[in-house]
């Protein structure tokens, strides 16, 4: 798949992961994630919660699952299913509590459908996602070394 203005590249300790972001599904979430990427927010952030057969979660600056960027996002629930490779926003009990934390599904997770904001899907590098160390919490966790928007490199 060709890189676009909505291609997010995560350089992880397990290798690169490309995500095609979907502003048609979640314009507010995509815009905010792009802002955070361009600020370097995700650089060095660990995958703090990784459940085998379910998902890998990242985006907490404390590495514990309790932190965020400080800006809550209004839910943008959509009809896109949670399947292998889906990227979706983590949140607390309130639907409008998503912030900077997100997860990548290892497998189908239809029980999350219409309850979490899907904002993209892995387009390449899913084999690297599969290698991320599991745990709750993860011991010596894998991390995002650098997050970048693909076309920013060409500018």
Language model region names:
Residues 1-155:
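Cyclophilin-like peptidyl-prolyl cis-trans isomerases
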């Amino acid at each position: 798949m060709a890189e676009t203005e909505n291609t997010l590249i995560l350089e992880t300790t397990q290798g690169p992961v490309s995500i095609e972001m979907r502003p048609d599904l979640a314009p507010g979430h995509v815009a905010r994630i792009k802002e955070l990427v361009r600020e370097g927010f995700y650089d060095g952030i660990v995958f703090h919660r990784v459940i085998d057969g379910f998902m890998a979660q990242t985006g907490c600056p404390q590495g514990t699952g309790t932190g965020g960027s400080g800006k809550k996002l209004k839910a943008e629930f959509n009809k896109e299913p949670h399947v292998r490779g889906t990227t979706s926003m983590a949140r607390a009990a309130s639907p409008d509590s998503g912030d900077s934390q997100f997860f990548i599904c290892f497998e189908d997770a239809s029980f999350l459908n219409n309850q979490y904001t899907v904002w993209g899907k892995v387009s390449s590098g899913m084999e690297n996602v599969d290698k991320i160390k599991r745990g709750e919490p993860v011991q010596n966790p894998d991390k995002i070394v650098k997050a970048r928007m693909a076309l920013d490199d060409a500018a």
